[in-house]
């Protein structure tokens, strides 16, 4: 692979263009009028959107896709002439693409420059006044909130995030200003390539055991990223961030710390959260947000710190945060039918599950059941955090567990969803194992009752059953109306 990105007009071709990170890059490049194409085995609304702005999408990943670009002029040795070789596309891959992928191999044989997704993001970050959000948890919400805040303040940023946001109807937007807000992913170690003007680190924990063996390895990656940031903003509520990274600007939910930004008078309500924000000992004003829970208040405080670093008045910051509705699949309300509330959340790490269920408990009315439906994500993560997962469901009244979503990992026979269910059952009296999505759907139709808050958790495809369950609950209502 190379790491040099050509922005002179050379085409970009993405293998796996429908992925959340890949599609964001493809969208911004297409909107900047670069020729963009890509392949994906599972065309979806994201690939359809890319087609609508001029991207050419292939429904298969095969060598013939790159024949689309093969120049017609060859020299006598049947080699690509220099002037035509320069017109070959830059082929972009993510870590998910195997080196045995036929399209990937064809790109190498044809002589295309092959780049990792992170190389393109790093080049865009270098091309703008960039704000990059990193951390084990909270990246998507924090980066989306910062992007929305800057948009509402009239700064018209370019935004690339790891989730879809209703405000810009997708996971990316192209602005016309110098500002870029990006979510910076640590999962494969490529975080070290980014050198933004402002970097944010929300927290650091061990995750992605398919790539990291120890927390120390994760810390090394974040330390390298931190050194590349001209200004580093970090939450000192995370001891690792506080002690090992020593951010330039700090924030904390605890007013008795020496953080630059703190809060007091925190009030959690069913319709959101309010708090009084302090800047280096001086009260800035009241911050209101529609999102619940301590972790979202912490995310909002990071956004305040960014806004102030950019010179925004607190009033403009607070106005943007107050109207931010969140990203999709981040405690997203999917519907309310027959007195049952359906919420979709991307949580797939024990810490994320714990705080998400705590937020659900805050929102639940007295006597309302919190039903957690969880699809474990990756065998390696499930095995590594088996004990932690078992202790993460204390705020749920009922836990429904599916089999493990592999996310492309091989099943080595070391762990199953049923084993995880048994571990959770040691800590929780109401645990049910339903291995498949159809069996989950059938069980929920028999079990959910008016007043329940049904929370679907996981980074896999569990959320696909939500419309089916909602529709099924609607049918009896139609029949009796």
Swiss-Prot record:
The protein's enzyme class: ligase
GO terms of biological process kind: cell division; cell wall organization; peptidoglycan biosynthetic process; regulation of cell shape
Compartmental location: Cytoplasm
Keyword Cell cycle appears in the UniProt entry: yes
EC numbers for this chain: 6.3.2.8
One GO cellular component term: cytoplasm
Listed Gene3D superfamilies: Mur ligase, C-terminal domain (3.90.190.20), Mur-like, catalytic domain (3.40.1190.10), NAD(P)-binding Rossmann-like Domain (3.40.50.720)
Family annotation (SUPFAM superfamilies): MurCD N-terminal domain, MurD-like peptide ligases, catalytic domain, MurD-like peptide ligases, peptide-binding domain
Catalytic activities: UDP-N-acetyl-alpha-D-muramate + L-alanine + ATP = UDP-N-acetyl-alpha-D-muramoyl-L-alanine + ADP + phosphate + H(+)
Residues holding ATP: 135-141
InterPro entries: Mur-like_cat_sf, Mur_ligase_C, Mur_ligase_C_dom_sf, Mur_ligase_cen, Mur_ligase_N, MurCDEF_pg_biosynth, UDP-N-AcMur_Ala_ligase_MurC
Keyword list, A-Z: ATP-binding, Cell cycle, Cell division, Cell shape, Cell wall biogenesis/degradation, Cytoplasm, Ligase, Nucleotide-binding, Peptidoglycan synthesis
Function per UniProt: Cell wall formation.
Protein family membership: Belongs to the MurCDEF family.
NCBIfam families assigned to the protein according to its UniProt record, in alphabetical order: murC
Protein name per its UniProtKB record: UDP-N-acetylmuramate--L-alanine ligase
